[in-house]
Structure formats: structure tokens, C-alpha cells
Amino acid sequence: MKILRWLFALVMLIATTEAMAAGHSVDVYYGYNGDSRNIATFNLKIMMPSAVYVGEYKSSQWLMTGEILQNVSWSGPPPAPSVKLIGYHQNINKASCPGLPSGWNCGYYTFEVIVSAEIESYFSCPWLVIMNDSEASPGGVTYQGPDSHDTICPSVSVQPYDVSWNENYVSKSKLLTLQSTGGVVEKTLSTYLMKDGKLCDSTQMNETGGYCRWVAQMITFTASGCDKAEVSVTPNRHPITDKQLHDMVVRVDTSSMQPIDSTCRFQYILNEL
């Protein structure tokens, strides 16, 4: 199930002045260009009610089935999870790798992620495993694939959740009035995840906060831009443990000293796993 949520920002310028005995199987999508010198970095995140742990892994130059990735860093208690390649596919539909550089193709690895007993002892739902791949070519071209997810917990319904401009109530539109200066005027607006009309606070390290982080992690976000050339917005994603989803940095070129009305649109899709 998916729920589509739209947020609008109207910018107005005034021109006056169970236990986890088995491993998780995760399909990780990646981009490739046939250059064996590319460097692959794999990012792993494990989210649970009491904590969020992140790790970085790398492979040998020629990643082969059966290889266990080398752990570079891990923020949780030792040992770091074991990540083993159990299969791969190439030349799949490029739609699975959004934003591919020109001339690159799309594929996916299937990894088995085995979590240590010490972390498993804290296991309770919501529990989510997230993994992605980042490829860097010698020529300086980089591509980070989409997040892949796995869990053994029941699906989380997104029906009670929404996205808002205000952390105190659900607000789908925002009127921003700015004063012209003859230069560039900048303003930052934040968005929030809501549940049943109230703030869903991902800073809480408990079951309630865990479900907020789960839903926030599964969001697909698109900025559709603004309908006037003088207005631009840069969305900055907050860490998953913050209560904000994005900071929208709005910039308005007021050099013309003329009134400007512009609408900026942002799409949030709340996905279920």
C-alpha cells in the first residue's frame, strides 16, 4: 500500500522595501559502467526501537558469490553484522536505479545479512534492515543506489500517518511572505511526520519512536520545484533520528524589485514494506 501526500509552499514577495536466528536477504541495486577500477561502498543501517546502528563495508576488486564484505566501520556493539554475497543480476530495468549516470547500467546484488547475538538479544519490532551501494569511477562519476529494506516484523500501515509543515497540527500548505531587498532572500522551512494528527517524534528511542523512524525511512520524496524562475528550493533531508523530515531552503531573487507569487510543490509517498 502507498499513500501519496502533497505539500505546497506559496512564496509571496512584497516589492516594497520473534528471534532472528536466520539472516536477512536484501536485494541491493547498483549502477555499473563496465570499469573494473570502480570502487564500491556498501552502507548498512539497522533500526530498532532502542537504537539506530550504521555500518560501512567494502568488497574486493572483483566481488564474487560467497564473498563476505569487509567491515570498515560499525556504530553498534561488536561484532559488526556479517554481509555475504549470495547472488547477483545485471542488465535489469534501469527504472530500478533512478538517477543513473549516462551510459551506466543497472543490476542488483543479493546479500545475506547476519546480525550478532548481542544485538539480537535486544530484538523487538519495529526492526528494519536498510542497505545501499555507492559506486565511484576513476573519472569522478559517482552513483548511490536506492535504499533496500528487509524485516521479519509485520507490515506497518501508513493510513494514520501524514506529512505537515507544522509540528503541532497537520498543515498541507504554507504561505511564506518575504520582503524584497534587491538581492537574494533566503528562508528555511521544515516538514514533519504526523500520526493521528500529532507529531510522530523519531527522536524517541522506544517503540513509539521506532515506528516513526520506520515510516520516515520508507518515504519516497520528490521536489517538483517552483513555477517562477526567481524562486528556488533546496531540500535537505534530516537524519532519521530527528523529528524533522526535511529542511526546505527557499531562495528568492528580488533584484527586479517586482511582486512575485510562486508555488512550490513537494511530493511525499508513504510506502509500506
From Swiss-Prot:
Domain of life: Bacteria
Signal sequence region: 1-21
Key words, A-Z: Signal
A GO CC term assigned to this protein in UniProt: cytosol
Pfam families in the record: DUF2544
Inactivation phenotype: Deletion of the operon under classical laboratory conditions does not result in any major effect on E.coli capacity to form biofilms compared with the wild-type strain.
Record flagged with keyword Membrane: no
Induction of the gene: Expression is negatively regulated by H-NS and subjected to cAMP receptor protein (CRP)-mediated catabolite repression.
Family to which this protein belongs: To S.typhimurium YadU.
Further information: The operon is cryptic under classical laboratory conditions, but is functional when constitutively expressed.
Function: Part of the yfcOPQRSUV fimbrial operon. Could contribute to adhesion to various surfaces in specific environmental niches. Increases adhesion to eukaryotic T24 bladder epithelial cells in the absence of fim genes.
Entry protein name: Uncharacterized protein YfcO
Organism (species): Escherichia coli (strain K12)
UniProt lineage: Bacteria, Pseudomonadati, Pseudomonadota, Gammaproteobacteria, Enterobacterales
